Curated annotation (Swiss-Prot):
The active site is at D67. It is an enzyme of class 3 (hydrolase). This is Ribonuclease Z. Homodimer. The gene is rnz. It comes from Halalkalibacterium halodurans (strain ATCC BAA-125 / DSM 18197 / FERM 7344 / JCM 9153 / C-125).
Length: 309
């Protein structure tokens, strides 16, 4: 699983940082690609990466501020010209349908693929299919804004070969079926339940990507024990009052949440342009407070391997 950051700034683009966008590539699932938020010039950033616009299957929007959605119309139109013939699903708060349909209609843009737009307003399960569960929770911003939690289904445990050999089952197709969780029948008529010949399930990976928000206690159980938490850190703590007034978090807020939720990795983004030329200082400050913290920059890629157990 790869996380590609195309925009790590806040509000408006700067020389160092574009506005919000992050793609996730699922390497073990035929390389499927999802996009979270789509600020202005996201498609241009994608051109400078290994992500293929035509292969993006789902887009998730945290909220309707311009720095998170102004790149959508152009990206949706360009997808048709970059091999994007397969269906595309777009998820976002109420209003995203009107924004997209109006922009495409006024600009006379016709997409050549099936575009499905799903609006949501209530937090909860968005879908559970293709080996992944996606859930949402409402945050605390100046407009409705959400976090997404993506949880990979658990994988079957290790095949207990010695136990199968003791049953007289030779290596072959039956091993593969059991590894896939299927019940098999031997030539003798005996049925073997897969669970009896598999070790403990291997926990699926998980991550939470939160949109703009003040600190919100409901995020603690929502992000509990996830592998990766992607959270805004618009300001440093000396601007805490200012941050909270405008619906944002500080670096210290995000780090406190990461500790309370016991996450493995924290990736900080949505950095104010006031901190230009301070990337090294920000990274040092974050890592001193949380060892597995990273202050993302544009084109930063984070790799999350398969869980071993």
């Amino acid at each position: 699983m790869e996380f590609h950051f195309f925009g790590t700034g806040s509000g408006v683009p700067s020389i160092e940082r574009n506005v919000s966008a992050c793609a996730v590539r699922f390497l073990q699932q035929r390389g499927k690609q999802w996009l979270f938020d789509c600020g202005e010039a996201t498609q241009h950033q994608i051109l400078r990466s290994s992500i293929a616009l035509g292969k993006i299957e789902r887009i998730f929007i945290t909220h309707l501020h311009g720095d998170h959605i102004f790149g959508l119309p152009g990206l949706l139109g360009s997808r048709s010209f970059q091999g994007g013939e397969n269906p595309l699903f777009l998820y976002g708060p109420k209003g995203i349908r009107s924004f997209v349909e109006t922009a495409l209609q006024v600009s006379n843009t016709h997409v050549k693929y099936e575009l499905t737009i799903e609006e949501f307003s209530e937090p909860g399960l968005l879908f559970h299919e293709e080996g992944f569960k996606v859930e949402t929770i409402l945050l605390d911003h100046v407009m409705p804004c959400y976090a997404f939690k993506v949880t990979e289904d658990d994988r079957p445990g290790e095949l207990l070969v010695d136990r199968l050999k003791a049953k007289g089952v030779p290596p072959g197709p039956l091993y593969r079926k059991i590894q896939q969780g299927e019940t098999v029948e031997l030539p003798t008529g005996e049925r073997l339940e897969a669970n009896a010949f598999l070790g403990p399930p291997k926990r699926g990976r998980s991550f939470v990507l939160a949109g703009d928000t003040r600190p919100v206690k409901e995020l603690i159980p929502f992000a509990k024990n996830v592998n990766v938490l992607i959270h805004e850190a618009t300001f440093l703590d000396d601007k805490k009052g200012h941050a909270h007034e405008y619906g944002h978090s500080t670096m210290a807020d995000a780090i406190q949440l990461a500790k309370q939720a016991n996450v493995d990795h924290l990736i900080l983004t949505h950095i104010s342009s006031r901190y230009h030329d301070m990337s090294d200082e920000l990274q040092k400050k974050a890592q001193n407070a949380f060892a597995n913290a990273v202050v993302a920059h544009d084109f930063y890629v984070f790799h999350l391997p398969l869980a071993k157990g």
